[in-house]
Regions:
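Short linear regulatory motifs enriched in tryptophan with gly/pro/ser
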Residues: 1-191
């Protein structure tokens, strides 16, 4: 039976919570980034970083602070087994996406499991609510956006309604679409 790692991914401070439960095969921490991106519904248009047990993981060239004070370990070279298939694995850690908007996610490692019948990793087992749109100002900007769209008398309503003519259905989430996205991989930019 192949190894499968199970994680619950929750967008921190989202209310009501936006979350996914994913099952992934052995791979690198960079692969986990790709699976989180696609399961959540992000577009991979910004930088990201994992913070696990007081260490930072990501792309060292992109995340160098210029002062040599923040050491970033290359996520391409770190296997999930290195972090989670050991006596004292990290149980909870964070994943930040888009340092401008500051989308913080808590990842809870739920264990190394046998995949449920009919579920081949990578896949999304369950989740709730739509991913917020990119570049809307983080969790607080998203809440403001939803407030504006809910009030046709709001002074910013026309502008926001132009960007989102059909509104935003925050409750829409389809597990099968998240699984399909996880298997297809990240969007290709510049094609």
């Amino acid at each position: 039976m192949p190894v499968a790692y199970q994680f619950k991914v929750t967008l921190i401070h989202s209310n009501p919570p936006v979350w996914r439960r994913i099952l992934v095969p052995e791979g690198s921490l960079d692969d986990l980034h790709k699976w989180v991106q696609t399961a959540m519904g992000w577009e991979n248009a910004h930088l990201h970083r994992f913070d696990i047990q007081r260490k930072h993981y990501g792309d060292p060239e992109m995340l160098d602070d210029g002062f040599g004070e923040t050491r970033v370990i290359d996520s391409l070279g770190v296997q999930l087994a290195d972090l989670f298939d050991r006596p004292r694995p990290a149980k909870r850690f964070t994943y930040e996406y888009d340092f401008g908007d500051g989308w913080m996610h808590e990842l809870e490692f739920e264990g190394i499991v046998d995949p449920p019948r009919g579920k081949k990793p990578p896949c999304c087992l369950e989740g709730e609510r739509a991913c917020p749109p990119e570049d809307c100002g983080g969790v607080w900007g998203y809440a403001h956006l939803l407030d504006v769209l809910a009030d046709p008398n709001h002074e910013e309503y026309e502008q926001y309604a132009e960007w989102f003519p059909n509104g935003i259905d925050v409750e829409v989430f389809r597990t099968n679409e998240a699984t399909k996205a996880m298997r297809q991989g990240l969007p290709r930019w510049g094609d």
